[in-house]
Design a protein with these regions (language model features):
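Phosphate/nucleotide-binding beta-alpha loop and adjacent structural elements of enzyme active sites
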Residues: 2-342
């Protein structure tokens, strides 16, 4: 009898334990279910809140196109210019990579105009070649400069180091052109003389070094693309560059940042007695680099119309007398695809 009672008690305890475990399991399942359901509801609410905003954004995006569809013209598309990292070097003039071969090709190239510029009969006599020396403009009616000067809508940039010859700048300013001269050696920060503005600003091929305090700089330093942007100028009819051996790196920067499209006429003084600022490599590589830069101009639709070898300069080509070549040339390039705006 006692054994039966003991057995029943043990059975009841086991049954109660099983029931307790079962109830605990059910509670856990119910809790998990409630939590999951709550998460699903929260996600659904968030999705509903975000959906109207997305629809609104799409509607706003479509609005300009819808407005443009009611007009005759498509909206203007602004394409961001993609800057290049380096220029395309031309093949060597000869397999031997010889300086003489490179120099002959280069000198032949800069001495052979690619287009002729006829001076229109209506042009002022002051624009004759004899009156402003080596800096010759292209006033051919096939291009835009003559008309821009006559309408007094021309803009001129002159990049220089010290005032040696500003006759062309003053001539263009006197003809009604808007002339900006950038020279770090002038006294005042910004000076104006009739249609001629003088800016104490150095045009560089690099951005200013942030480690150098502005107080230590005698003049500001900017790239030409930044100056155009700051001044709100989209185009320049004439760009004159006389930077005493910095012209190579400046030209490279104009090519890489695609500023050439904004220039109608390029007047460039070359200094050949040494490689130039920050131009590295052996002598054949230097001349190949020079030639490649000018070929980049040609690919940008510029054509050489004027070449002047200065007879008063030393006969030096990379520190040596090479074919009695002058160390200084002035080249004139016209952008055959330049279309003035405004």
């Amino acid at each position: 009898m006692r054994l039966q009672c003991t057995f029943r008690k043990r059975m009841n305890k086991c049954l109660l334990l099983r029931v307790s475990l079962l109830l605990s399991l059910l509670c856990i399942c119910a809790h998990v279910y409630v939590e999951l359901k709550g998460l699903c509801l929260t996600a659904a609410v968030r999705l509903q809140k975000q959906t109207p905003n997305r629809r609104h954004q799409k509607a706003v995006t479509r609005t300009p196109l819808a407005d443009a569809a009611s007009t005759c013209c498509r909206p203007l598309k602004h394409h961001r210019r993609i800057h290049r990292w380096k220029i395309d070097l031309e093949p060597w003039a000869a397999e031997t990579h010889d300086l003489q071969e490179e120099a002959d090709r280069f000198l032949r190239y800069i001495s052979t105009p690619q287009v002729s510029c006829e001076r229109p009969a209506s042009a002022l006599p002051v624009f004759d070649r004899e009156d402003h020396g080596s800096w010759v403009l292209c006033l051919d009616r096939r291009f835009s400069l003559a008309e821009r000067i006559e309408s007094k809508h021309c803009r001129v940039y002159s990049l220089r180091l010290g005032v040696e010859d500003d006759g062309l700048e003053r001539l263009l300013a006197g003809s009604g052109c808007e002339v900006h001269c950038f020279d770090p050696s002038i006294r005042g920060a910004h000076l104006q003389d009739a249609h001629m503005w003088l800016h104490r600003l150095s045009v560089d091929w690099r951005d200013p070094n942030p480690a150098v305090p502005a107080q230590r700089l005698h003049s500001g330093t900017k790239k030409l693309a930044a100056i155009l942007n700051d001044f709100g100028h989209r185009q320049v009819d004439v760009l004159k560059v006389d930077l005493e051996s910095a012209e190579w790196k400046i030209l490279e920067n104009l090519i890489l940042e695609q500023v050439l499209d904004s220039i109608g006429l390029l007047l460039l003084e070359l200094h050949l007695h040494w490689a130039g600022f920050e131009v590295g490599g052996d002598e054949p590589s230097v001349v190949r680099y020079w030639f490649s830069l000018l070929r980049e101009l040609e690919r940008a639709h510029f054509r050489l119309y004027h070449s002047y070898s200065d007879p008063t300069k030393p006969r030096l080509f990379l520190h040596r007398n090479l074919r009695n070549t002058s160390s200084s040339f002035v080249l004139g390039w016209v952008n055959t695809q330049f279309v003035p705006q405004g």
